[in-house]
């Protein structure tokens, strides 16, 4: 069954005729060509598919596209504004908080969601907030350092 689903994606209106039960991950990657959102485990365990929905980090491999109707979705492609990296993206680069890069989009968006809800997290709060995101390269310590640095640069999660 085809539904008309309208939402905002990376600050732009989107209107799709699509099966509303289709996973947001596949709509983003296949239908809209936004491949920064990664398919990792398909079960919500790794965090590679994380996007922001109304500012909250969610796993797009578990979210049906009909669940984002009339909401704001942000992918890694929409995080930088006017060619300027978001403070979290900048901090990841400055702290060398990536290696292969596969987990990075999900890590960055999870961190943005965390800092939006908790602008001044402790290291322990960052660890808890990021524990559902996996990095097989072992960059976790640098990722936490980057998030702490970004928190210092950001004002109220923005």
Regions picked out by a protein language model, each given a short descriptive name:
Residues 1-158:
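Signature of N-terminal electron-transfer/Fe-S-associated modules in redox systems
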């Amino acid at each position: 069954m085809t539904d008309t689903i309208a939402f905002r994606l990376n600050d732009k209106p989107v209107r799709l005729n699509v099966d509303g039960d289709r996973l947001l991950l596949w709509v983003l990657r296949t239908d809209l060509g936004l491949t920064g959102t990664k398919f990792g485990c398909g079960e919500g365990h790794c965090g590679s598919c994380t996007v922001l929905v109304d500012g909250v980090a969610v796993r797009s491999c578990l979210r049906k596209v009909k669940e984002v109707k009339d909401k704001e979705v942000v992918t890694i492609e929409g995080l930088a504004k006017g060619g300027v990296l978001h403070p979290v993206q900048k901090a990841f680069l400055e702290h060398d908080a990536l290696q292969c890069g596969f987990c990075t989009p999900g890590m960055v968006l999870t961190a943005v969601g965390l800092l939006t809800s908790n602008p001044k997290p402790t290291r322990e709060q960052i660890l808890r907030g990021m524990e559902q995101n996996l990095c097989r390269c072992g960059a976790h310590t640098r990722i936490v350092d980057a998030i702490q640095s970004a928190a210092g640069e950001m004002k109220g999660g923005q």
